[in-house]
Amino acid sequence: MDKVYMAIKKCIVSDYPYDLDWNDEVLYKLFIDTYNAIIEEHSHINNSYYSDDEGGKLMLNYLDHYAIFCFRFAKRLHKEGLIQIADATYYSMRIRCSIDLYYTSNIGECFMPVHALGTIMDSHAIYGRHFKIYDGCHIGPYSIVGKEPKEWVHPTFGDYVTMLAHSTVYGNSVIGNNVIISAGTNIINEEIPDNCIVSGSSPNLVFQKLRISNKSIRKE
């Protein structure tokens, strides 16, 4: 585990353009806590990249996993008041994984970014458990011109939602549970029901019943 910690430290420190006040005594414990928490989460994902018969996996040379670790670690650092290291961890994730996911975001357990290059996730949106997102996606507020940021409205996602490549969700959108958002779909200020596949662009969305549940990804 010491080698893994040192590898992560090397990545974060070398990526950041400024000197860091890195305290190994404090940060090693937070690293271990974060690492073990992710292993536990991954043990409940029915996917060979995330778990096997021996339990959860965290392969930090696999950039999807690196993004997950950086997000969870930065969030923990922020909670502990270690803002500079949280910023550096976020910075490392952003340049190595090409995903913009700020550590103040609220994401449920078993988050799965899948080759999520060029994806931007709204840090004020609410994301449920087993949220899965692919490349080129964008999530954010809508119609913000002339409004203060505190007036912006952000999307909410239920559990077991998958956003396929180049799909977008904006504004006062509420996405139900067990939903697949098809590639290229554009959702603006819409309420999406549970158990469906949605495609098209607002206001002309098309809905199909989801016959194979996203919940099959869950392993108890």
Where are the model-predicted features located?
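Terminal amphipathic alpha-helical/low-complexity segments used for targeting or macromolecular assembly
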Residues: 1-94, 213-220
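Structural signal for interior beta-strand "rungs" in well-ordered beta-sheet cores
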Residues: 94-210
